[in-house]
């Protein structure tokens, strides 16, 4: 088991991708990419493939799906020389322990079975997630979200909470929607959606894309290289993901009060480009709230009695605590994706009332950053408390370039650089604005990171 733990520690550095071929020659497609771990089904558990992968610095992780005989599969995986096993779905603790006796294990259950308290040592992940992009109605029009702008399907709020609650490396292992052939931009969105939240998306291609890539078709290879350029962008700046979330607004939540739902309160606030720090209820402390001025306490009844003094001290210092009406419960969603259409009128009205309280308190205050002319985009602000370096990620979920974006930050900064995939860095000129300092960005195709100091 000690050896397994040593191997497992190394898996925290895995840049993962699902791989559908067991042909050693297919590994050539991973050359000059950041991918260093491949997830393969049992059909590719051949010693020849594993040996070839090891020769080019790629670890092979075997996938065991729900319903499989995991104990027997673990023995075959060990005999083939696999580095670890990935178990997807629901397995008993007894079965997982038996598999762990053979090889290190990465568990990817549904969200309801995430073990946040046990995640720090080896990482945590799930296969259950929204496919990132603008939500489109049946008629082809963009769906409006609770905030009034285009509804962005995202896992960002969920991933940010999991990072805050567990302190672990997080894998988002959702697959593309079945039966759809997707443009490469949708894969870029999936990679960016996880990366800006501090996680990693397990790269997964639809059958058409995978077929074109393995056949070395020009378009398939070009799309693959473009996707890999974006994955590399986030890996080259991995230190940014370890910066603490910045901003003066905190959201106090736990798994029982909607924190595991995509499209939940963190995502609703994020759609306004208002930076928000997730704080898990069990981690509530003055240290976690340092530097904030506003706290949204989504379910006051869930705060342990011993921690309520922290909230009282926070308010006594002149800070604002926003709480919903007594008895409010965040609507439960079986698939962990908020959908206004599936809410009862009562739940809809209650959620709308809470949202109005939040927006009325926040107003147009600059709680860390304001982003203008960016519909269909999401942002995330990171940086050390007390000023210094700040990094603002910007992700475009639309099918067109975003142009003429303006960013205002409350702190004064002397330098501003815009980092783009492919290694391009643009120097921007800061200027004084009413709320602090601002910069203008001419155009963003898919992803950018604004670094200021």
What are the language-model segments listed below?
Residues 387-391, 402, 434-438:
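A generic structural signal for beta-strand entry/edge sites
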Residues 201, 342-368:
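Catalytic cores of secreted or luminal carbohydrate-active enzymes
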Residues 237-257, 364-399:
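Surface beta-strand/loop "capping" patches
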Residues 265, 397-414:
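Surface-exposed beta-strand/loop patches in extracellular or lumenal glycoproteins
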Residues 417-437:
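Solvent-exposed beta-strand/loop surfaces of large extracellular or lumenal domains
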Residues 2, 7-301, 305-319, 324-332, ...:
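Glycan-processing catalytic domains of CAZymes
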Residues 306, 318-319, 432-453:
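C-terminal beta-strand-rich structural cap/linker in extracellular carbohydrate-active enzymes
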């Amino acid at each position: 088991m000690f050896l397994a733990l040593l191997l497992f520690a190394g898996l925290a550095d895995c840049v993962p991708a699902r791989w559908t071929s067991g042909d050693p020659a297919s590994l050539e497609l991973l050359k000059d990419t950041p991918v260093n771990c491949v997830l393969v089904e049992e059909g590719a558990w051949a010693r020849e493939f594993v040996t070839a992968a090891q020769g080019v610095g790629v670890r092979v992780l075997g996938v065991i799906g729900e319903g499989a005989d995991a104990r027997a599969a673990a023995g075959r995986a060990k005999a083939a020389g696999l580095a670890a096993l990935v178990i997807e779905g629901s397995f008993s603790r007894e079965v997982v322990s038996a598999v762990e006796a053979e090889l290190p294990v990465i568990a990817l259950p549904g969200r309801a079975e995430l073990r946040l308290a046990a995640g720090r040592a080896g990482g945590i992940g799930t296969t259950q997630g929204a496919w990132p992009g603008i939500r489109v109605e049946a008629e082809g029009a963009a769906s409006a979200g609770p905030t009034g702008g285009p509804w962005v399907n995202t896992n960002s709020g969920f991933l940010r909470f999991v990072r805050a609650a567990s302190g672990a490396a997080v894998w988002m292992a959702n697959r593309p929607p079945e039966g759809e052939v997707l443009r490469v931009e949708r894969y870029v969105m999936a990679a960016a959606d996880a990366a800006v939240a501090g996680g990693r998306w397990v790269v997964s291609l639809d059958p058409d894309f995978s077929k074109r890539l393995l056949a070395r078709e020009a378009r398939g290879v070009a799309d693959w290289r473009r996707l890999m350029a974006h994955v590399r962008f986030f890996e080259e700046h991995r230190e940014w993901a370890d910066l603490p979330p910045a901003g003066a607004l905190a959201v106090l939540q736990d798994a029982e009060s909607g924190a595991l739902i995509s499209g939940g309160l963190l995502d609703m606030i994020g759609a306004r480009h208002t930076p928000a720090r997730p704080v898990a209820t069990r981690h509530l402390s003055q240290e976690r709230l340092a530097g904030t001025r506003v706290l949204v306490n989504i379910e006051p009844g869930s705060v342990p009695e011993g921690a309520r003094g922290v909230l009282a001290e926070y308010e006594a210092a002149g800070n604002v605590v926003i709480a919903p009406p007594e008895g409010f419960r965040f609507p439960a969603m079986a698939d962990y994706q908020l959908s206004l259409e599936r809410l009862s009128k009562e739940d809809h009205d209650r959620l709308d009332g809470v949202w109005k309280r939040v927006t009325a308190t926040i107003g147009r205050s600059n709680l860390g950053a304001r982003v203008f002319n960016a519909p269909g985009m999401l942002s995330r602000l990171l940086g050390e408390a007390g000023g210094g370096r700040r990094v603002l990620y910007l992700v475009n979920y639309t099918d067109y370039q975003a142009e003429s974006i303006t960013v205002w930050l409350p702190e004064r900064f002397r330098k501003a650089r815009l980092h783009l995939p492919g290694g391009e860095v643009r120097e921007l000129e800061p200027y004084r604005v009413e709320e602090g300092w601002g910069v203008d960005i001419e155009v963003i195709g898919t992803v950018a990171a604004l670094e200021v100091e």
